[in-house]
UniProtKB/Swiss-Prot annotation:
Glycans are attached at N44. The lineage of its organism: Eukaryota, Metazoa, Chordata, Craniata, Vertebrata. PROSITE patterns: WAP. It is found in: Secreted. Changing C49R: In BENP; likely pathogenic. Gene3D superfamilies: Elafin-like. It comes from the Eukaryota. GO terms for biological process: antibacterial humoral response; innate immune response; proteolysis; spermatogenesis. Keywords: Aspartic protease inhibitor, Disease variant, Disulfide bond, Glycoprotein, Protease inhibitor, Repeat, Secreted, Serine protease inhibitor, Signal, Thiol protease inhibitor. Changing C103R: In BENP; likely pathogenic. Expressed in a number of normal tissues, including male reproductive system, regions of the respiratory tract and nasopharynx. Highly expressed in a number of tumors cells lines, such ovarian, colon, breast, lung and renal cells lines. Initially described as being exclusively transcribed in the epididymis. This is WAP four-disulfide core domain protein 2.
Length: 124
């Protein structure tokens, strides 16, 4: 008789361990490298992700106001400086980069005031 009880008990224990292990693996992914870019606040509060593990490839889960999006990360620290729209950087109205890694040293790929992006010294 004890052997009959051990079967269902063992099955329940095994099922519990499998579910617990699955939760640990899928619930928290390792944070991906890079830093989230500055994103405009989304008024729709769209929740595309909760953690980096929910984003494909090297995309990071980044917040924009009350929303979250999978976004291509910046790979350098610091934030882009505020752009003075009254004095756009003349001569730089073309894209010089797409991501931080294309900029030399500590420079970051940031908006330059005329609708394009260029390598600039970040604020720390």
């Amino acid at each position: 008789m004890p052997a009959c009880r051990l079967g269902p008990l063992a099955a329940a224990l095994l099922l519990s361990l499998l579910l617990f292990g699955f939760t640990l693996v899928s619930g928290t992914g390792a944070e991906k490298t890079g830093v989230c870019p500055e994103l405009q606040a989304d008024q729709n509060c769209t929740q595309e992700c909760v953690s980096d593990s929910e984003c494909a490839d090297n995309l990071k889960c980044c917040s924009a106001g009350c929303a979250t999006f999978c976004s291509l990360p910046n790979d350098k620290e610091g934030s882009c400086p505020q752009v003075n729209i009254n004095f756009p950087q003349l001569g730089l109205c073309r894209d010089q980069c797409q991501v931080d890694s294309q900029c030399p040293g500590q420079m970051k790929c940031c908006r330059n005031g005329c609708g394009k992006v260029s390598c600039v010294t970040p604020n720390f």
